[in-house]
Amino acid sequence: MLVLSRKANESIKIDSNIEISILEIKKDSVKIAIKAPANIKILRSEIYDIIKEENKKSILQDKNNIHKIKNLFDYLSK
């Protein structure tokens, strides 16, 4: 992990197409701006974690549904 210090109105470049700018620094928060191509997904970590959990739930539900369909198919095949 790279750790950098930046002041307000300074920025960080990642590759040639991503720029992270420090807009404002307050007592307990930092306001940042991120410029990146539209195909780069940028999410707050708490939103990412929620999406990840919902995807896990969906996969488990799909597995349950597949199992139910298989059981029904087995029953109907008799």
From Swiss-Prot:
CC terms in the record's Gene Ontology section: cytosol
Family matches, as SUPFAM superfamilies: CsrA-like
Source organism superkingdom: Bacteria
Record GO terms (molecular function): mRNA 5'-UTR binding
Keyword flag RNA-binding: yes
Signal sequence extent: none
InterPro entries, alphabetized: CsrA (IPR003751), CsrA_sf (IPR036107)
Keyword Cytoplasm included in the entry's annotation: yes
Gene3D superfamilies listed in its UniProt record: Translational regulator CsrA
Predominant place of localization: cytoplasm
Family named by the database record: Belongs to the CsrA/RsmA family.
The protein's assembly and partners: Homodimer; the beta-strands of each monomer intercalate to form a hydrophobic core, while the alpha-helices form wings that extend away from the core.
NCBIfam families, per the entry: csrA, PRK01712.1
Protein name in UniProt: Translational regulator CsrA
Organism: Borrelia turicatae (strain 91E135)
Lineage, uppermost ranks: Bacteria, Pseudomonadati, Spirochaetota, Spirochaetia, Spirochaetales
